[in-house]
């Protein structure tokens, strides 16, 4: 309903030991789709662009575009629509942070 009313919804882990020990954004995206009724597209916008805007970082992160910091996840999926169905599995193949591929420690 909030999205239909034009509100910008943000998804985040808000990791806080003791009250919220979830660190997995794929899990948060899955929960938003399965229990809150967001489409996968709405969940991705909420987890990326809207999150960047909420932190006043929309000129740096939150989109894949020229001039943006390249923070990317590479997934083992045929479509982003599969994410809610893999919520308990790590389907991430690789991570890029600021344009550099990270060593596979995830």
What is the predicted role of each segment?
Residues 1-75:
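His/Asp/Glu-enriched, well-ordered alpha-helical/loop segment
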Residues 49, 69-106:
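C-terminal cap of metal-dependent C-N hydrolases
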């Amino acid at each position: 309903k909030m999205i239909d009313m034009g509100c910008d919804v943000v998804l985040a882990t808000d990791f806080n030991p003791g009250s919220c020990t979830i660190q997995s954004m794929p899990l948060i995206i899955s929960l938003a789709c399965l229990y809150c009724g967001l489409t996968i597209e709405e969940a991705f916008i909420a987890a990326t662009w809207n999150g960047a805007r909420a932190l006043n970082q929309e000129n740096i992160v939150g989109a894949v575009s020229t001039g943006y910091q390249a923070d990317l996840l590479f997934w083992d999926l045929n479509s982003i629509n599969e994410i809610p169905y893999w919520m308990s599995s790590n389907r991430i193949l690789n991570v890029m942070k600021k344009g550099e591929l990270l060593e596979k420690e995830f």
